[in-house]
Swiss-Prot record:
It comes from the Eukaryota. Residues 22-71 form the F-box domain. NCBIfam families: F_box_assoc_1. This is Putative F-box protein At1g53370. Pfam families: F-box, FBA_3.
Amino acid sequence: MEKLKQQFSKDRLITPSSNLVRNYIDSIPVDLLIDILSRFPPKSIARFYCVSKLWESILRGPDFTELYLTKSVALRRLFFALKVNTELLVFSSPQPQIPDENSSLVVEATPYKCFPKKIPTEICTALGGLVFLGTFLSRQPLVIVNPLTGEFITLPKLKTIGTKRFSFGYDPISKKFKVLCVTWSPCGTLPNIHQVLTLETGERLWRTIHDPVIPRYSINYDAICINGVLYSEAYYQGSSKIVCFDFKIEKVSFVNIDGMCNLRLFNCKGKLGVHQYDVQSRNEKLVFHVLEDAEKHKWSKSICILPSVVSGKRIVEITCTGEIVFSPSGGSLHPFYIFFYNIERKTYTRVQIKGFKKYADCVHTFLDFVEDTKLI
């Protein structure tokens, strides 16, 4: 917060001496003020935190946040995190409207210049306007960043002993971001420890989840949060399963996956999709499963033949309009393309993203990123 205040202190819209102007603005009815402020672009909203305590309170409130994000649905963006040597670069671009026929589009990616660069980057999750960063080594710090404002926080360390996996999610009921830590002991006999940190104002503390049915299991690195449920591949009782952690009720459950393993998890129109990764496959045929009913362990299976242009690309997501989105995972990024392939029409759109550096060690691509002005 202090960093943000210093950044805008020189060019505030209302200076400390403008008491009459501030008093007049603060006399505007709150409902009207919320509506007026919701019409401004994100960068302007970030400046308004410094106008007055009333404005800061309004901008932090759930009513403004919900209204602003609702209006921002049409402003969803593509978000990219690039690792170049030890430096992390983040960009976003407009998320294009996909035409009905084969086509090529070009969009310009703009960097977030105030994003801190020298921070852990092995784990990268963009969710709801925030970015969660960390490493697989528990001694390294975990960081949550708002790329629009440049504000970031370092999460408190845990004292539990054992192998840890951290995941980032969102609880749509309480409208709060949460971080899950799963720890399993090195001795191999004790049940896993589940701890949750809720991202909110005030002191940030890890809470241990006391669930008597939690067994011992090990989880893969890949995890995805969909509609408040965190999914990841797990190894439990000698077989591969999907472990589900519901952030809304903070409970663990498992879903059978019929012998599949080495899975890539993705969002498929608001449901969990899994694709069995085969390093020798050239992606000429895509076989994926969609979780239809977690309680009944019910999956649907789809097979589609892919065009050669997406061979070797990584699945990012299947959009609500039915496009499979593919992105390169790293290497040469000049030029950099992502592909939208429509399963029903069998058409693809190649989107060139301009503005990247030529090479990167890895690149993370996210859809439907909405810039959020709310401070952490």
